[in-house]
A protein has these predicted regions:
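N-terminal pre-transmembrane cytosolic regions of membrane proteins
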Residues: 1-166, 439-441
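Short linear functional motifs in flexible/disordered or boundary regions
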Residues: 2, 24-33, 259, 303, ...
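A broad, low-specificity signal for short, low-complexity segments enriched in glycine/proline
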Residues: 57-67, 170, 175-182, 208-209, ...
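Short linear motifs at secondary-structure transitions and domain/linker junctions
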Residues: 66-69, 75-83, 184-197, 304
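Extended alpha-helical interaction modules
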Residues: 91-274
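Membrane-targeting and insertion segments and their boundary/processing signals
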Residues: 214-221, 225, 297-315, 340, ...
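Structured inter-helical modules in multipass membrane proteins
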Residues: 235, 244-254, 261, 270-340
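Hydrophobic alpha-helical transmembrane segments and their immediately adjacent juxtamembrane loops
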Residues: 331-441
Length: 441
């Protein structure tokens, strides 16, 4: 007899609890506007939402590497003192459009829910050894072994401060246990002063639950594809927070470079200053592009994945990450920086224009002086060098009584040129005064 197909996927059934620590790294792929790697649907079950993820594969996280880790090779600083058993571990590397490479360190732990707290602490603060190597070095080695090109200027891959932890359980947990996991502290709480949020769409069924905190989220008795979608949302948001941190640091660095250019104008030549301003301008344009496509686009998932539970969790995590406020702050920083950069470029243009005016003045004075001296002398020498009836070979060229008509003609030409210059100068001043409104026409 054929069993009927259920109208929806069942909730996940695991005998262990899963911790997935999502960490932004300092590594970036060469093409920032195009995510490298393979579609996540090849590794993660996305259920009925898979077509939407495939359609938007270039705008969502892609898998660079997926590496299973021997559970016996793991050493936890705090977790070693518990009776828990680490059953399975895996390292994921994701690439996100216009964002850094994101590492996801997942471990399956068989224990009571509260015993997860030491493991959460170890994973969050990188107090984990993998095959006698720190987690950071293991991530760098895995990325080096992946078939992907990263930006060489970044140097050795390191784990950044932007991270979020996901806890997946196969059964719902008491609210008090949830708060202990979210705050990573086995202490009592006062619910009135708690900031933990419970997404409505993920808690609408009495048999399932979810809680979102600033750094830890808990999903209980959810369907497997919902868990995977939530993990991909966390990857995208952590990448966005890592990118906006980089943009903020780059904006501050650009401001210091502009200030140094403004303070010490003699350290660099004009060409070097202009080249530096162009480099800063190009850097800021690239940062604005990455802010739009790497951060702002991550704030909304519903237009790509039309699913209430996925969208609800994504928005809740966006709110806790403070991504919208950070976007506004960094956008204002870039706008002010553009104003400062524009003022510095205008100042440089003014200096260059003044230099051009002085250069033209020097050339004009030199050419004018040569003209005043050379033209009359040329006329005089041309007159005496010709075979004219007025030229007497027996007389000196300085004989004023004999040659005064020629000398007077040359002097008259010089004075006429001077008069024309004074007239044009007076006319120019009058026109400028009329434009400025200081001369009555």
């Amino acid at each position: 007899m054929t069993l009927p197909v259920p109208p929806f996927d069942p909730t996940v059934e695991r005998s262990v609890h899963r911790i997935s620590t999502v960490i932004a790294t300092t590594a970036e792929t060469v093409d920032l506007l195009r995510a490298e790697g393979r579609p996540p649907s090849e590794f993660l079950r996305l259920g009925r939402l898979e077509p939407f993820y495939i359609a938007a594969v270039q705008q969502l996280p892609r898998v660079l590497a997926c590496r299973d880790i021997d559970a016996d090779s793991l050493k936890f600083r705090r977790g070693e003192s518990t009776t828990a058993t680490v059953c399975k571990a895996r390292l994921w590397l994701f690439d996100v459009q216009a964002g850094p490479v994101v590492a996801v360190f997942s471990v399956d732990v068989e224990c009571a829910p509260k015993v997860l707290i030491p493991f959460l602490e170890d994973c969050y603060y990188d107090h984990v050894m993998v095959e006698s190597s720190p987690l950071e070095r293991y991530v760098a080695e895995t990325l080096d072994g992946a078939d992907v090109q990263v930006v060489a200027s970044v140097g050795v891959t390191a784990l950044g401060p932007q991270r979020h932890q996901m806890v997946f359980t196969s059964a719902t947990l008491p609210e008090d246990t949830v708060q202990r996991i979210v705050y990573r502290a086995d202490l009592d709480w006062n619910p009135v002063y708690s900031s933990i949020q419970f997404p409505a769409e993920l808690n609408r069924r009495p048999s399932s639950g979810a809680a979102v905190g600033a750094y830890v989220s808990v999903l209980s008795a959810q369907q497997d594809y919902i868990e995977n979608c939530a993990l991909l949302s966390a990857v995208q948001i952590v990448a966005a927070t890592g990118k906006i941190r980089q943009i903020r640091l780059a904006a501050y660095d650009a401001l210091l470079r502009i200030r140094d250019l403004s303070r010490d104008r003699t350290a660099l030549s004009t060409a070097e200053r202009r080249a530096e301003l162009v480099r800063i301008n190009e850097t800021m344009a690239e940062q604005e592009l990455q802010l739009t496509f790497g951060v702002e686009t991550a704030c909304e998932i519903g237009i790509l994945i039309p699913a209430l539970r996925v969208e609800n969790f994504h928005r809740q995590l966006i709110e806790y990450a403070g991504l919208t406020d950070n976007v506004s702050t960094v956008s204002a920083m870039l706008a002010r920086l553009a104003s400062v950069l524009g003022a510095e470029q205008a100042s440089q243009d003014s200096i260059d224009a003044r230099k051009q005016d002085l250069r033209r003045l020097r050339y004009g004075v030199a050419v004018g002086f040569l003209s005043v001296v050379a033209v009359p002398i040329g006329i005089i020498l041309g007159f005496f060098g010709g075979s004219y009836r007025e030229v007497d070979a027996e007389r000196s060229i300085f004989d004023w009584r004999h040659y005064y008509p020629m000398y007077l003609s040359v002097l008259g030409l010089v004075f006429f040129a001077g008069a024309v210059f004074l007239f044009l100068f007076w006319r120019e001043r009058r026109e400028l005064g009329r434009v400025a409104g200081t001369v009555t026409p």
